[in-house]
Amino acid sequence: MKFIVGIVIAVAMVCGVYTTNSITESIDKTSNNTVTTQTDNNYNKRILGGWESSASGGSYYVFNNDNTYYWYESSSNLNDNYYKGNMEILHGTDAMDELGITLEQVTTVMSNSNYKVGINNIYCIKLNPTYLISGGVDKTNTLTDKFNMKLLFVYVDENNAQAYNYTTNDTYYLVKK
């Protein structure tokens, strides 16, 4: 866990982050005429699209608005060696809970980044592959739960992010493509 907090601190110190606090609320009536309030945040929209690893020949993630994703071994070949599947995006305190990140750890990160990184920059992206192409061959029938991944995704700005893959223990510096 200290390693993960170190990653978040490094992002905060090196890149800086712009956050917003715009949350809109909408009132929705349920079938029994009880009024409920739903928080509609647009934070997830900022991570949608393609994110390429800054490493030479690095992997490429595409997060879609319909809760699907693609993971490509390389952005230079989008026809082979890729997964596609379903994803769930958790944001803020929900992401922290899922990943086991404490408020104390985030507070330390916020302080070390001069309050440029905060809870609104933290995401948990749960990836569940449903389709696999490897070496030009459909290998979907080989997928098991061990292929599910969980990412800590720290949004830096509209062009930069950092991710830590809890499943593989890999760290990625990502650039919006």
Placement of each model-derived feature along the sequence:
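Sec-dependent signal peptide cleavage junction
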Residues: 15-34, 38
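Sec-dependent N-terminal signal peptides of Gram-positive bacterial secreted proteins and lipoproteins
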Residues: 1-21
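Short, solvent-exposed mixed-charge patches
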Residues: 30, 175-177
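Structural signal for glycine-centered tight turns and loop->strand junctions in beta-sheet-rich domains
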Residues: 67-69, 159
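Contiguous, well-ordered beta-strand patches that form the walls/edges
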Residues: 54-58, 75-159, 166-175
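Short, intrinsically disordered, low-complexity terminal segments
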Residues: 7-9, 32, 92, 158-160
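N-terminal helix-cap/turn-to-beta initiation motif at the start of protein domains
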Residues: 34-50, 62-64
